[in-house]
Amino acid sequence: MAVYVIASLTIKDAVRFEDYKRTVLPSMEKYGGRFVARGGPIDVLEGEWPRERLIIAEFPSIERAREWWGSPEYAEPKALRLATADSELVIVQGV
């Protein structure tokens, strides 16, 4: 069953964050990951939304998503994200 990695971010260093954007997708592909929503303006329907960006990536299973998150391929992009943005990541099951 497909799962979704959802990340909410506030960019602190837009110049260096471009390196993250360039490297993250290649790190996901080996694990069957792909973006289904990435960046762009967020249209808040209710309440407060604390972050300026939302990213949703689809993986074929929770195991593949966790393998990617802990993988050597994602190590450099993860370090870039942590250095250039405040973020939260969760995994949710698809239906």
At which residue positions do the language-model features occur?
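Short S/T/G/P-rich N-terminal loop/turn motif that feeds into the first structured element of a domain
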Residues: 1-56, 60-70, 74, 93-95
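C-terminal end-helix/capping segment
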Residues: 82-95
